[in-house]
Amino acid sequence: MLYQLYLLIAIVALVVMPCQEVAGTEIETRPGNTCIQCHAGKRAGFIEGHSFGADNCIICHGGDNSATSEKSSHAGMTGFPGLLDNAERSCGNCHADKVSSVSNSLMHTGRGMVSVTRKIVDGSIGNEASANLQSLGHGPADSMLRKLCSSCHLGQKKSAHKLDPVRDRGGGCLACHINDYPEEAHPALSAKVSDARCFGCHSRSARISLSYSGLAEIDPETAAQQDSRLRLADGRHVERKPADVHFASGMTCVACHKGVDLMASAGDAVYQRDAVASRCADCHEISRAVNQAHDPVHERLECATCHSQWVPQCFGCHMQYDPDGRQWDHVEQMETAGRWHEERSDFRNEPGAMGVNANNRIELFTPGMVMTLEHPDWDVEKFVRLFAPISPHTIGPARSCESCHRSSVALGLGEGAIEYRDDEIHFAPAHPLLGDGLPADAWTNIDGSLGGRAPRQGQRPLNREEMEAVLTAPLP
């Protein structure tokens, strides 16, 4: 029997944000609400902060609540107030500042994703700050974004009164602030956001929602050898891995990622990590305990470099464009000519590679793109190898000294046999070399002459000197 696994997420509310009266906003109670003649049950379900809506349907939905016919009542009405194309005149009546900032947030514009995809696929370097999922063209990179990637931005319209944690995309304000669609009551608009609202978008790409809850995507062939019953509703096979200690303790996503992160209050960030305001030190006093793990030689390490238990990694991706096929265009909201076929393989969910970020600190990196691409505009297929920084959200006890100081994977060289002798690093890769001279799971080679690509200036793999320092460090 095949069990479909929607989520392995415990929805625990640690923080319930109180609803506050919005300064300068006054809701007028309007008598004679004819909406309830057909929708009497929808007066129930409101939380206190939105209880005015029980007799003021048109405040959010529009329409005419004095009309007596269905046609007249529904004229100019919207069934989903809170979609970003109507949020200014619905949610914006009370939350104008939030609607404005959300519309400029990365969850709507995807600035960093658009910029990196264009750079890698088309080789173009445009104005990162102006990149936007709502203004895509039709070149290879933008076509890929239209057909495969832009389904997760908040501007996507919601068109069904139901929740699907795995497949849900978009919906503007509703994407986060509605947790249930009861049949006999009005959905409760709430600042209590469940992890299920994050899962639909954040279980792909970096797979943060999966990792946090202790699930990891695997190859179907691998699943056949393990527990094939573990499968998401969209068909992806997963395995159980150690969950993040914060998840195990009952912390939800919004316990750390609050409005300042999610609704662009932090500013006009281009990349996701620049929009995140929360830090480990907000809760954990960073003390330099008297032991080897915290001595000065580790001062450049980010907390997650040692405390991440594993990192989701994928080393085999193939993308092929078929101009004769048809596929849903998430910008046009219709099926259009051209289809991208995507194949993924070679998953690994183990400790990952270390690299240097733009602040000269050492953090974890994972394959952002190790793939081949085919498009009729190109004479030959393209091969792309790019590693990106990642916060895996698999926090736990610190990894062992050996897992860094005696590991070729940690150095970014990929799996294989490594040793330091005769003042030289000797490495024999476990996997065959690809066309660019590196094995599939490597980011760079020992002298840094191959690979090494990262999304942003200043990000890089460890250099030879840093590798030697890691390998020659005495172990306890």
Question: Model features per residue range: what roles?
Answer:
Residues 187-190:
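A generic local secondary-structure boundary/capping motif
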Residues 14, 19-44, 53-174, 192-476:
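C-type cytochrome heme-c attachment and multiheme electron-transfer modules
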Residues 1-5:
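Positively charged n-region of N-terminal signal peptides that target proteins for export
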Residues 175, 184-185:
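Thiamine diphosphate
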Residues 6-16:
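Bacterial N-terminal signal peptides
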